[in-house]
Design a protein with these regions (language model features):
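Glycine-rich, N-terminal phosphate-binding loop of Rossmann-like dinucleotide-binding domains
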Residues: 94, 107-108, 156, 241, ...
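A conserved beta-strand/loop capping segment in the N-terminal third of enzymes
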Residues: 67-117
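A Rossmann-like FAD-binding core segment of flavoenzymes
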Residues: 31-33, 70-83, 98, 174-285
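FAD-site-proximal beta/loop scaffold in flavoenzymes
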Residues: 2, 112, 121-148, 255-294
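Beta1-alpha1 glycine-rich phosphate/pyrophosphate-binding loop at the start
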Residues: 2-74, 158-203
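Glycine-rich dinucleotide-binding loop and its adjacent helix/turn
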Residues: 107-181
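Short acidic, glycine/proline-rich loop/turn micro-motifs
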Residues: 44-48, 116-118, 273
Length: 294
């Protein structure tokens, strides 16, 4: 009897360990195939460093194929355009159809820049560190900014769910400017949709509020919480600050020469399109074992 075929969608910090551990547990009797949109692995936690030039792209990426082949794991570098859950197959951008017995979804999210007009690095006015490509664009914009320093706005957009990297980047950004003796020319404002500093989308972690407020003060970074960015224009961000009841507290018009704002996330299109698989934001509904309920 032939063994099962397990397909892992995504080759990031979730997908790669999943593939390795499945192979170690299942041995050679079952086949494992990893499918990823690009042929390289990117170590996402280092993106904030790349965005200010503290790391080179080559230091935080590596080719996926050779790493998986050493373990006897097949690899396909192609975007997935459709998941046929009923037919147990995925369709690739090049037209190929890959059948599976079990599917592991580890694609990561899609960045929903379209939810705030004028945001994002592709046709918008804010930078991102969500991918290595975005971090590279952020670095190029940062180098242009250094030629004519001015105000900077860093933070997270409405609907964002990953706030830690925004704080990390704010401190890295401030430190790099200090090293260049330019910090005094760059007033920094931290704008976040969190109800308070250090909430992190988790209701706080220990004394994260006190620690992060203290560090922001130490770095001379002002902040606006409960912030709803409504629009971004060239050199200007429009922000509505809300009170605890969700009512408008104050309207802000923030000038900037550089801005890095983490976007809200949604499920990637191929995953979100599967009927009954996801919630309205496109994230997979799971049980206590992280298995799909579908």
């Amino acid at each position: 009897m032939a063994g099962a075929h397990i397909v892992v969608l995504g080759a990031g910090i979730g997908g790669m360990p999943a593939a390795y551990e499945l192979k170690a547990a299942l041995g050679h009797e079952h086949r494992i195939t990893v499918i990823n949109a690009v042929d390289y692995f990117q170590f996402v936690p280092s993106n904030p460093w790349l965005a200010v030039g503290w790391r080179e792209r080559e230091a935080i990426t590596l080719p996926i194929g050779p790493a998986l082949e050493k373990k006897g794991i097949a690899f396909i570098a192609q975007p997935v355009v459709r998941i046929d859950a009923e037919g147990h197959a995925v369709q690739l951008e090049d037209g190929r159809r890959v059948a599976y017995d079990y599917l592991v979804i580890a694609t990561g999210p899609r960045q929903a820049f379209e939810e705030v007009p004028g945001s994002g690095p592709h046709g918008g006015h804010t930078q991102s560190i969500c991918t290595v490509d975005h971090a590279g664009l952020a670095l190029a914009e940062y180098r242009r900014f250094l030629e004519a320093p001015g105000p900077a706005v860093i933070g997270a957009m409405p609907g964002a769910s990953c706030f830690g990297p925004a704080y990390e980047f704010a401190f890295i950004f401030s430190r790099d400017l200090q090293k260049r003796k330019l910090r005094h020319k760059v007033p920094i404002t931290f704008v976040t949709s969190e109800p308070y500093i250090g909430h992190l989308g988790l209701g706080g972690v220990g004394d994260s509020r006190g620690m992060l407020e203290s560090e922001l003060r130490n770095h001379d970074i002002k902040w606006i919480c409960n912030a709803r960015v409504t629009r971004v224009e060239a050199g200007r961000m429009l922000v509505t600050e809300l009170d605890e009841a969700g009512q408008v507290k104050k309207e802000h018009e923030l000038p900037f020469g550089y801005s890095m704002m983490l976007p809200a996330f949604k499920g990637v299109d191929a995953v979100a399109a599967v009927e009954g698989l996801c919630n309205p934001r496109g994230f997979v509904l799971i049980d206590e074992h992280q298995r799909s309920r579908k």
